[in-house]
UniProtKB/Swiss-Prot annotation:
EC number, as in UniProt: 1.2.1.27
Keyword check for Mitochondrion: yes
Domain of life per record: Eukaryota
Entry GO terms, CC: mitochondrion
Subcellular localization(s) per the UniProt record: Mitochondrion
Phylogenetic lineage: Eukaryota, Metazoa, Ecdysozoa, Arthropoda, Hexapoda
Record: active site: C303 (nucleophile)
Gene3D superfamilies reported for this sequence: Aldehyde Dehydrogenase, Chain A, domain 1 (3.40.605.10), Aldehyde Dehydrogenase, Chain A, domain 2 (3.40.309.10)
Organism for this UniProt entry: Drosophila melanogaster
Keyword Mitochondrion (UniProt): yes
Assembly: Homotetramer.
Protein's UniProt name: Probable methylmalonate-semialdehyde/malonate-semialdehyde dehydrogenase [acylating], mitochondrial
Length: 520
């Protein structure tokens, strides 16, 4: 039985018995093998719906992290010299294996992260789409050639890998974000040292089993676990040439600065405050349904969650209808059929969310839907927050200036579209935004004037497919190249430009030319 099936069986077994300190340990993945850590420091991973421990994650030792890095270095020498078709074949096989095992991956994500099974499958699917895009690597990594730039002279460019790269992934998308990282890195010829979130390690470990089955050589991807020491190791190791990060502002800025000072290329996706602008001419029913789903789906724990709504003019009369829709959403454990909103990731997250809700009330916002005291029968120890709506919020309130990252929608009001655009552009974040309207001229004005990296027109969560790139801007991103798509290929590669001269007359002896070359 493969590791995927073993872990799936263990998860089902754990669900049937009482939890104990005898929870299984998560392994490191080094040189193609799952390795038990020798550390004496462990992190408990809790099922957010039950608060019960499902696994223990090691804080990898310095020796273990160094061993993983040495394995990456060794593998790069051979992997980068493999034909591009060989690397493509690994992606073809990985794509098929992920499809076959999507159910097991989704169950693991729900157990460790809490999101609904349907949302967990979407998590896997959006990552799978990046793998599918990587199957086009012979075209994506193609260089350029100009023949006869001068007489008998040709110039061409090669798109080459960097070397050892690293990825630091967040808790909210246990499969999708690692799949943003390692497939692009390794298909372009790099190797990768990957650190998944210590809160949700399981999906990454399942993906490593599938990567082995796909025929990826040992050491091309290694996985370490940990917290600050692991991040510092990645930022400081001179052998690592590039670091990909998705997560919080604090961690993202830290990694960007520390890794950058050490000469590494960095892409850092960070926080967001995504606004939905609702105009009075929008399709009311569709707009309110999309707004509720985008605000409260995944318990609001998406970097592209529509956490802020700006109702313009006559659309302000729709706010009570939005509350009614939010009240109908079912809050329960993620594996329970029919669940719309699962738990948040931890007790600390729940407390932070509740504190931000309370701060809004104290600063004058109207709490028109309060989900703080929700109780889910059978899951009384879970980390649940029900859909919550704060209205009459102003840009100076803490609930607006900080990313809540929970099932909380803050509502602002504006008289005109110009006012709404001004609100969005004054916010320091620039990850995503959306406008809801049936007026093409209004939509075009919004698209042209809004200062955000990803814009939806009647699309609440405009995350691009992998033929494009995830293009957050301003306070939501630091770096030069974004994730996946053409920019993702650029991030993990470097260009070597070759100019070669083969004169026809070189077949005979000629006199040396000492004048400055003029390229004529």
């Amino acid at each position: 039985m493969s590791l995927v099936r073993l872990i799936g069986a263990e998860a089902r077994h754990l669900a049937k018995r009482s939890y104990s300190s005898a929870a299984p340990t998560t392994k490191l993945f080094i040189d193609g093998k799952f390795v038990e850590s020798k550390t004496n420091e462990w992190i408990d991973v809790h099922d957010p719906a039950t608060n019960q421990v499902v696994t223990r994650v090691p804080k990898a030792t310095q020796a273990e992290m160094q061993a993983a890095l040495e394995s990456n270095k060794k593998a790069f020498r051979s992997w980068s010299n493999q034909s591009i078709l060989t690397r493509q074949q690994v992606m073809f096989k990985l794509q098929a294996l992920i499809k076959e095992n999507m159910g097991e991956l989704a169950k693991n994500i729900t157990k460790e992260q809490g999101k609904t099974l349907a949302d967990a499958e979407g998590d896997v699917l959006r990552g799978l789409q990046v793998v599918e895009h990587c199957c086009s690597i012979p075209s994506l990594q193609m260089g350029e050639t100009v023949a006869n730039v001068a007489r008998d002279m040709d110039t061409y460019s090669l798109v080459l890998p960097l070397g050892v790269t690293a990825g630091v992934a967040p808790f909210n998308f246990p499969a999708m974000i690692p799949l943003w990282m390692f497939p692009v890195a390794i298909t372009t010829g790099n190797t990768m040292l990957l650190k998944p979130s210590e809160r949700v390690p399981g999906a990454t470990m399942l993906l490593m089993e599938l990567l082995n089955e796909a025929g990826c050589p040992p050491g091309v991807v290694n996985v370490i676990h940990g917290q600050h020491d692991a991040v510092n190791f990645i930022c400081d190791a001179p052998e690592i040439k590039a670091v990909s990060f998705v997560g919080s502002d604090q961690a993202g800025k830290y990694i960007y600065e520390r890794a950058g000072k050490n000469g590494k290329r960095v892409q850092s996706n960070m926080g967001a405050k995504n606004h939905g602008i609702i105009l009075g001419d929008a399709n009311k029913e569709n707009t309110l349904n999309q707004l509720a789903g985008a605000a409260f789906g995944a318990a609001g724990q998406r970097c592209m969650a529509l956490s802020t709504a700006v109702f313009v003019g006559d659309a302000q009369a729709w706010i009570p209808d939005l509350v009614e829709r939010a009240q109908k959403l079912k809050v329960n454990a993620g594996h329970v059929p029919g669940t719309d909103v699962g738990p948040v990731i931890s007790a600390a997250s729940r407390q932070r969310i509740n504190d931000l809700i309370e701060s809004g009330v104290k600063e004058g916002a109207k709490l028109i839907l309060d989900g703080r005291k929700i109780t889910v029968p059978g899951y009384e120890d879970g980390y649940f927050v029900g859909p919550t709506i704060l209205s009459d919020v102003t840009p100076s309130m803490k609930c607006y200036t900080e990313e809540i990252f929970g099932p909380v929608l803050v509502i602002l009001k504006a008289d005109t579209l110009d006012d709404a655009i001004g609100i969005v552009n004054a916010n320091p974040y620039g990850n995503g935004t959306a406008v809801f309207t049936t007026n093409g001229a209004a939509a075009r004005k919004f698209v042209n004037e809004i200062d955000a990296g990803q814009v939806g027109v009647n699309v609440p969560i405009p995350v691009p497919l992998p033929m494009f790139s995830f293009t957050g801007t301003r306070g939501s991103f630091r770096g030069d190249h974004h994730f996946y798509g053409k920019q993702g290929i650029k991030f993990y590669t470097q260009t070597k430009t070759v100019t070669q001269l083969w004169r026809k007359t070189d077949v005979t002896h000629t006199q040396a030319a000492v004048a400055m070359p003029t390229m004529k």
